[in-house]
Amino acid sequence: MTLELVTESLLTKNQINHQDVFSCLEDFCTHNIDYGDFYFQSRICESWSLENGIIKEGDYHLDQGVGVRAVSGETTGFSYADQISIDAVRKSAHMAKSIFDKKEKIKIKPLLNQEKKFFYDPINPLKTFTSSEKTNLLYKVDHIARKTDNRVVQVNANLSGSYEEILVVSTEGNLATDIRPLVEFSVSVLVEERGRREKGRSGGGSRTNYSFFITQDDCFGENRIDYWTKEAVRIALLNLSSHEAPSGTFPVVLGSGWPGVLLHEAVGHGLEGDFNRRGTSIFTNMIEKKVASELCTIIDDGTMKNQRGSLNIDDEGVPGQCNVLIENGILKKYMQDKLNARLMNTKSTGNGRRESYSHLPMPRMTNTYMIPGKSKLEDIINSVDYGIYAINFSGGQVDITSGQFVFSTSEAYLVKKGKIFSPIRNTTLIGSGLEVMQQISMVGNDLKMDQGMGMCGKDGQNIPVGIGQPSIKLEKLTVGGTV
């Protein structure tokens, strides 16, 4: 079904047919290239913003174009056009191949549509609610936040959605299409008490439509947008009563879900194929070597139903896949796109991703998580005599080459004698990805994915990702605090 819809939208409406595309691909092969591809894309985005009970902004944006890539060895020729027409395709193709020498024209395989599984429905979320229904959701958020506690002095909320169509054709004879919906909600609350102000944030999203936000979640016991609004208030109030964090080296318990961002940054990026091909990752040449505790199995899975990082196909037309990266502490594979896979004599793992038609694809994560273990969270906490329990993070940075990272928490607690003692603030976690993976001594049975707000940046390209993990215990980690 997506083939007909996407072909009609991206090709037929722009007076292009399959034979036109095939002809351009054939002309492409008059130069000395290993392979090449055309990436057609259309993306419609909208967002609505509320500040203190007033709709401050409503934005609607349409972007479409085609990116053309020619690859020979390690060299890539790339050109793109911000319009879709047969002339734009031909000109972009000519520019992309022009850096290579000419050769005798060869025939390419007929374009065949790839069979694929669907991990989200081909729907347009922008059409599921009217404009007034979308803004009323935001007004409701403001009302709920202020009703929850009279110390709330400011409420900011954002609702956004996008509808994306892509079509990929290659000199290998592949033809692949996808329709990608995505919705997201975020809320930030400011509370004040006796002159002290603190913030709390929450939200979520999914590859579905806006009704996702007003549907009850069994884990929450209420609809998602109500829960996330109250959660933002809870975190803000918690920060009002928090104490300064201690500093030193302690056992650290990371909660389930979003704390997996530490693994994403400190470990996940280091397992991307391009860094390892260039020898700039701490995991270079470590396949089949022990890189983590035997309790650790880490997956990158683009096939999870409706998850933010899921892909029916990646941005090179390769079907979404589930890849075991680390199994029982042993490094099994890197995440690969087509280019790096060819240069490393392996296959693409379905991780070729790009921000848009105007960017080149590269190896990127999809939904990355650690599988659950056997320990109960209560037992993990009980095992800590004095340490930190970190439930949420606000930001961080990592050096891919050294694996060194620094992360800041947005919700954390001091643990004493196996009991959660008090909330703490200004907490930073400092360490090395490789060392941290060896420090994992307990893995919980409570795997949870993040709520659907993950955004990953690399080389100036931002893409949606999923992050998850069960609760885990790190035997020791450097904690930066103020006490």
Swiss-Prot record:
One Gene Ontology CC term in the entry: cytosol
SUPFAM superfamilies reported for this sequence: Putative modulator of DNA gyrase, PmbA/TldD
Enzyme Commission (EC) number: 3.4.-.-
UniProt KW Ribonucleoprotein keyword: no
Protease listed as a keyword: yes
Biological processes per GO annotation: proteolysis
Keyword line: Hydrolase, Metalloprotease, Protease
Entry-linked Gene3D superfamilies: PmbA/TldD superfamily
EC class (word): hydrolase
Any one GO MF annotation of this record: metallopeptidase activity
InterPro entries: Metalloprtase-TldD/E_C, Metalloprtase-TldD/E_cen_dom, Metalloprtase-TldD/E_N, Peptidase_U62_metallo, TldD, TldD/PmbA_N, TldD/PmbA_sf
PANTHER family in alphabetical order: METALLOPROTEASE TLDD (PTHR30624:SF4), UNCHARACTERIZED PROTEIN TLDD AND PMBA (PTHR30624)
Protein purpose: Probable metalloprotease.
NCBIfam families the record matches: PRK10735.1
Protein family (similarity comment): Belongs to the peptidase U62 family.
UniProt-recorded name of the protein: Metalloprotease TldD homolog
Source species of the chain: Buchnera aphidicola subsp. Schizaphis graminum (strain Sg)
Higher taxonomy: Bacteria, Pseudomonadati, Pseudomonadota, Gammaproteobacteria, Enterobacterales
Designated gene of the protein: tldD
